[in-house]
Amino acid sequence: MKLVGLILFFLTFFSKLQSEGIYNAKSFQLKNGMKVVVVENKRAPVVSQMIWYNFGSGVEEKGKSGLAHFMEHLMFKGTKKFPDNYYSNFISRIGGSENAFTSYDYTAYYQIFPKYELEKIMQMEADRMVNLTLTEENVEIEKKVILEERFQRVESDPSAKLDESMRSILFPN
């Protein structure tokens, strides 16, 4: 009975949020083909921005596994306009947070920050999409970071190794 009451509460609560227009999504496409979805939340002066690229580990060529995850890391290395660590330091300095993740079908980057910085964050995001600056040094550093992540997440976990083996059979590339 308590479970039914709890479910009814959440259904009522989220229906109210939807009816008040708190989570109404609007979507459109830019001239360059990029799809944009905006979900406005009027409860706080904060923005959550996510950029999803249709490039994940499932589309990597044979012999190039890990490239999507590697690029995810390298995208934080900066540009001429916003050098190494500027992006992350800026978001942290304004009280925001950011991260990224790679899946089989996509790589996603997200930030949460005060809405008054939206224009600046979007400029930085657009800049790193086309002006990423890589050096041999920062490529080598990230390579070591990824190998350590692999050791922690896969090599030291038998179930993760099994999962990886099964996926290599299901998806030969």
Predicted regions and their residues:
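Acidic/histidine-enriched segments that form metal/cofactor-coordinating
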Residues: Y53, T79-K80, Y87-N173
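Intrinsically disordered, low-complexity regions
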Residues: L6, I22, S57, G96-S97
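His/Glu-rich zincin catalytic helix
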Residues: L17-Y86, Y110-F113, E119-M129
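Intrinsic disorder/low-complexity segments enriched in polar/small residues
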Residues: L3, L17-S19, R150
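Sec-dependent N-terminal signal peptides
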Residues: L3-F13
